[in-house]
Amino acid sequence: KDEKIEELTDQLKRQMAEFDNYRKRTEKEKASMYVIGARDIVEKMLPIVDSFERGLATVSDSEDPFAQGMEKVYKQLMTAFDELGVKPIEAVGQEFNPDLHNAVMHVEDENAGENVIVEEFQKGYTYKDFVVRHSMVKVAN
């Protein structure tokens, strides 16, 4: 009788441990799905950020009310990105890192160090610890 109680107790403990592992695994999967979904949304919004930056770069009259309004909307968008954990990748002056940067050009430059980024063509971004878009850069050899 004691043997049967011990066996059933052991089975119950195993079942509880198995269920606990299942719960932890599903929580982890759910969190991962959220990050993947958010990353996809951020990726789809990056061309909008690029358009804002290109448009604002062409404005010569900073007193123009329309340009000021667009600047405010851009800043609001970038603040929201920052609060969500979306960060621009530092590029110019940094050492080339293939995990963060995509080298599209190489240049011989004695003034720049070996494998140092001298120009950024398109800004890259990370969301949490994931690269959403690599920076497109020119690297010195």
Question: Where are the language model's segments positioned?
Answer:
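Charge-rich, N-proximal long alpha-helical rod segments
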Residues: 1-53
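Structured alpha/beta interaction-core segments
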Residues: 51-141
